[in-house]
Amino acid sequence: MRSLLQGHDRQRTAAGTALPPLGGPHPTPTAHQGVATAMRPPGRAAGTGCAMKIVCVGGGPGALYFAIAAKRRDAGHDITVIERDPPGATYGWGVGYGDDLLDHLYRNDPDSAQAVRAASALWQDQEVRRGEQTAYLGRYGYSIARATLLDILTRRATELGVDVQHRRKVDDLAELADADLIVACDGANSRVRQVHGDHFGTRLEAGRNPYIWLGTDKVFSRFTFAFEPTPAGWIWFYAYPSSAEISTCVVECAPETWRGLGLDTLDTADGVRLLEQIFASALDGHALLGQSRGEAARWQHFTEVRNATWCHDNVVLLGDAAHTTHYTLGSGTRLALLDAIELAHSLYTEAELPAALQAYDKRRRAALHPVQAAARTSMAWFEHLDHYLERDLVDFAYAMSVRQGAQAPWHYQLHRATQVPVLRGVRREANRGLRRYLALRRGEMALGTGSVTRRATTTAALAAPAGHQQ
């Protein structure tokens, strides 16, 4: 394994003058972690480290954001991102996130953060539907079309000098023999990881319930859970806006229901038509969309990916190649972006490549342990949904909202109050004030339309403490 001080010791250019620290010392690892400080190689002043030749296999958000974060810290890095699909092609529909991720994005690269926020939809409240009954949860969040996110990050990476290559497939790691570092960002079925499977100690565990990731031309204003009874059992979806025209809609059910409805034998088009009939009320008659990336959506089972270590020699895992979390937690892309920030941080702070990879491995694996545990709990809750669905809907919605752990008694009282329209409006106004405060604190000037104004990246802003964590 190469030292950062050997071989490709390309000195950074004037354009790559070291950034000041992007955050303070690391706290106890959490899933929100992702700050950076200047690299300090032995005998060198802070911020005068060496550049490397880095290749990212896979061109998803994690790979692109790592390239951005690494280039922001050292413009001398020679970074290539290799993606097998053409530009604009992506699976799935939307990506959800919260203010905590925006804090990290603004701290690490305000330019792309502003573009992401401006292109995102805001959803206020969560709506839980069971037949014609409705209950509410007083949470808010943001979502963005995955294709739009990829476009923003690709353009920003290219601006910073990253070589983003599409329509290229890596069949043999020998093609990358001249790379100082190979970052495996090629998803849960990572071929790069499989080459060194014995070293990474990969464990795969499949969930019980089948699910299918669809779109819909109904634009939801709230994050919506819809549960519908059928002769074969309960079936449900999770939906949220992806853009001004489209929402994401993930449908799930027990395997007995899936087979009982014939969804295991119907082709995609017929299966989608059946789901449209089942969810006609919740969809207000709108269509479900079963084509993504030019391919028909298919039913699948979630697979949890865990690895005993995320690095081997000069290969390191990032995002779904390293770990997966159940979609009911909604954290996959967010966690990949935090991995990207942490890896860039470790490369920037450690003098030797082995030490950098070990630091990244230690911190992010520690941060992911509780997240994956919570995701397993969430998955199991939905796999045993029949235990809860006969409850009063308001109590069912509360049980769903606290499925990852007990809450203080007042939390239930707040939930009951949220069912009253006037009090729900008060809570929404309080959330609006919180959003504005957080936006101002991170330098984003929220306007009535939800757009943002540009803020210059100053040394003081980059050195600010870690952002709000939800």
Residue ranges and their predicted role:
Residues P86-H104:
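Conserved N-terminal glycine-rich FAD pyrophosphate-binding loop of Rossmann-like flavoproteins
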Residues H345-Q470:
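C-terminal helical "tail/cap" subdomain of flavin- and related membrane-associated enzymes
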Residues G62, P87, N189:
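Conserved Rossmann-like nucleotide-cofactor binding loop
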